[in-house]
Amino acid sequence: MNKREMIRLRIERAVGIANTDPEGPKLARKMANGKLLVKVGEELQIPIKVENGTLAIVDDPSHPRAICAFSDAEAAWALLTNSLSPYLATVHRKLDQMGLSTMNETFEKIWLLAHERLDEKN
């Protein structure tokens, strides 16, 4: 499995945890309805639809309300596995969050929750 596939799987798991974990829906309900587009460099786009506190990965990336853009696969993996803090990633231009800030901030909390839950299982 290459890094992009691992990142996609990690984000899919984060979306699943947001919908099923006791803490996940509380976070997801803080997000506005619409789309969040997760980008990894120029090679990977993962659109996530948010509707009434439920997240789903969809095919259409058009018209996102927020964009969470990782500079490359290495930066994305480091952030998604909590090896790099979002603050340092932003300072060093590894993470760019645009659009509706509450969507980006909440998604950040969701991916950190996913890391915590996935780490507990291992």
Region locations from a protein language model:
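Feature captures hydrophobic
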Residues: 1-122
